[in-house]
C-alpha cells in the first residue's frame, strides 16, 4: 500500500455559492485578491477577526453583502490527475469560509437622481465637486421618497428551521362506507357527563347513552361513591375528593358520570347531583346550595385542600362552598335559623334574597380579611349583620322611574349623622380594597382552578 507524505503547507478553503466561470469576476465578488489574501492570513492568526464578504453586484455600492463564517477544519487538499488517477500535493486545510447567512433585502438605486448626484460628487473625493454639492430643501410633493437605502434591512441572518411535519396524532382511517377521513388517533378520553340548568322541567335519571361500561378501576371508584350519594345527594368535587381514597383522585371525573349529573347554572352550579334527585323540589336541598367566590391570590397563599369554611383559615384551592359545609359561628346560624321560600328561586334557591345576599357579603368580607392575613373587622361584620334584609323585588327596583330630586334628597340624607359618616368611610375603604385586589366578585366565569370541572 502506497503512502503519501502530508505537506507542511496549510490552506484556507472558500465555499463560494456561485459558479467560477470567470476568474476575475469571481474574485471581484469577494472584494478582490487582496481582500481574499488578507482574510485568509487573518483566519490563521485570529479567526474571529477574519472578514470576507460576498457581493453579488460588486459595482453597486449600496448592495448589502453576505459575510462569511469561519470554521476550523482538519481536511486534506489533494491534486488528482484524471489520466492515471494519481494523487499529489497532499496538504492541510485549517480554515473554511462558509456563506450560510441569508442575503439581505436589496434596493436598486439605479433610477434615483439623488443617489446619482451623491455618487458623482462626494464619492469621487474631488474638492470642487464637493464644494458645489448642495441639497434642494424646497418642499416638493413626490410620489416616492428619494433617499439612500439603510445599511441593513433585516437582522435575521440565519433561516428558520421550521421542520414542518404531519401531526403524528392524526391519521387517516377508512369508514364502513368505504370513504376515508382524518381523525385524532390519540385524543383525550371524553367524559360523558350530563349537564342541566335551572330552566329544565325534569332532571336526568340515568347516565349518558354513549357512556360505555366502566373499567375495573372506575368500577371501584363508583362503588366508593354510591354510599356517599345515598347519604348526601348533592356534592362538590372537592368535597368528594376529601371523602375518597387519594388514589382515586385521577379516576373521579370518569366515575361521576355513572352516578350523577352536573348543574351549570343557578344556586347549585358546579355541584354533582344524584340521578333522579331534583333539589328544586325539596326544601331540604337548601343545605346543598353553593356559594361562589373569585379569589385572586399570589403564590404565598397555601393551605389544605378542604371544602369546609370556618371563617378563620384561608383555603386557596377551594372557590365553591356548600351551605352544609359552612361552620363559621357567625354565618352558620343565619343559614339555619331562617324562613325558606315556598318555591326554589333560580338565583337564590330556597333562601330569601335578603338573607342570601347578607350571607354572601359576610363571607366576602371574611375572605378579604384572610387574604390580607388579618382577622375580619368587627365593625364591618356588625354593619353587614345589622343591615336590612331587602328582598329581591326591592333590591332591584328601577331607579329610572324615580324622581331625580327625591333620589338626590335620599343621598343627602345619608350624611346627617356621625354614624352615617363612619359607614361611608367603611364603604370607601371597602371599594378601595376591591379595586386593589380585583379578587372578589361573584363568579361570572369559572376560576382558574375550575376551568375544567371534571378535574383536569
Swiss-Prot record:
Q: What are the transmembrane regions?
A: none
GO CC terms for this protein? cytoplasm; cytosol; nucleus; transcription factor TFIIIC complex
Cellular location of this protein? Nucleus
| Composition bias type Acidic residues, residue spans | 441-456
Pfam families membership: Tau95, Tau95_N
Q: Which UniProt keywords apply?
A: DNA-binding, Nucleus, Phosphoprotein, Transcription, Transcription regulation
Compositionally biased spans, kind Polar residues = 407-416
User: Where are the annotated segments for Disordered?
Assistant: 394-416, 437-456
* GO MF term (any one): RNA polymerase III cis-regulatory region sequence-specific DNA binding
Spell out the post-translational modification annotation for this entry. Answer: Phosphorylated.
- GO-annotated biological processes: transcription initiation at RNA polymerase III promoter
Q: Main localisation, per the record?
A: nucleus
Record-linked InterPro entries: TF_IIIC_su-5_HTH, TF_IIIC_Tfc1/Sfc1, Tfc1/Sfc1_N, TFIIIC_tauA_Sfc1
- Summary of the function given for this chain in its UniProt record: TFIIIC mediates tRNA and 5S RNA gene activation by binding to intragenic promoter elements. Upstream of the transcription start site, TFIIIC assembles the initiation complex TFIIIB-TFIIIC-tDNA, which is sufficient for RNA polymerase III recruitment and function. Part of the tauA domain of TFIIIC that binds boxA DNA promoter sites of tRNA and similar genes. Participates in the interconnection of tauA with tauB via its contacts with sfc3 and sfc6. Serves as a scaffold critical for tauA-DNA spatial configuration and tauB-DNA stability.
Q: How does it assemble?
A: Component of the TFIIIC complex including sfc1, sfc3, sfc4, sfc6 and sfc7. The subunits are organized in two globular domains, tauA and tauB, connected by a proteolysis-sensitive and flexible linker. Interacts with sfc3, sfc4 and sfc6.
Q: What is this protein called?
A: Transcription factor tau subunit sfc1
Species name: Schizosaccharomyces pombe (strain 972 / ATCC 24843)
